[in-house]
């Protein structure tokens, strides 16, 4: 007979909140892909590709925040540890997604790594790092934490 207390009814099981976090990440990936397409079609011709990539980072961060804001209650992660676990999931999935997408589009490893390297003007690493805290920040601002 187990003496462990059952989880509260309002908190999804560990796998459930991560599964919901994954579904929210799919929305982030879709919106970020559209954001990248729009940047390439409209911003890059005006500013040049390198500057357009830098200028677009705040918009990408805003997309992640809005998805976190809209989905954090549904995801159901309430503790700081679980919220950061969702953020870590988003971060790892998005870094992998970006690298696979860039490789499939024929970008060199030098170009991909430059996007993440602030010494070379890349801000993508900073934008990606914000993903780690976005679920926690959204929960806090919504009064769920």
What do the predicted segments below correspond to?
Residues 17-58:
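N-terminal first-folded block
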Residues 38-47, 106-116:
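Membrane-interface helix termini and inter-helical loops of multi-pass transporters
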Residues 61-69, 124-138:
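Hydrophobic cores of alpha-helical transmembrane segments in multi-pass inner/ER membrane proteins
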Residues 49-54, 76-92:
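Internal alpha-helical transmembrane segments of multi-pass membrane proteins
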Residues 18-22, 26, 54-58, 83-88, ...:
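Hydrophobic alpha-helical transmembrane segments
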Residues 137-145:
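Membrane-interface capping segments at transmembrane-helix boundaries
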Residues 1-15:
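Short, Lys/Arg-rich, polar N-terminal cytosolic tail immediately upstream
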Residues 50-51, 113-125:
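Short aromatic-rich membrane-water interface segments that cap or initiate transmembrane helices
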């Amino acid at each position: 007979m187990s003496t462990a207390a059952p989880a509260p009814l309002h908190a999804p099981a560990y796998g459930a909140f991560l599964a919901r976090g994954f579904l929210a990440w799919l929305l982030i990936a879709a919106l970020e892909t559209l954001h990248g397409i729009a940047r390439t079609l409209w911003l890059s011709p005006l500013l040049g590709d390198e500057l357009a990539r830098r200028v677009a980072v705040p918009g990408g961060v805003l997309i992640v925040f809005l998805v976190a804001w809209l989905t954090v209650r549904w995801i159901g992660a309430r503790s700081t540890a679980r919220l950061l676990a969702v953020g870590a999931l988003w971060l790892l999935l998005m870094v992998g997604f970006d690298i696979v997408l860039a490789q499939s589009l024929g970008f060199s490893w030098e170009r991909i790594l430059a996007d993440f390297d602030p010494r070379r003007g890349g801000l993508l690493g900073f934008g990606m790092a914000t993903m780690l805290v976005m679920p926690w920040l959204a929960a806090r601002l919504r009064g769920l934490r």
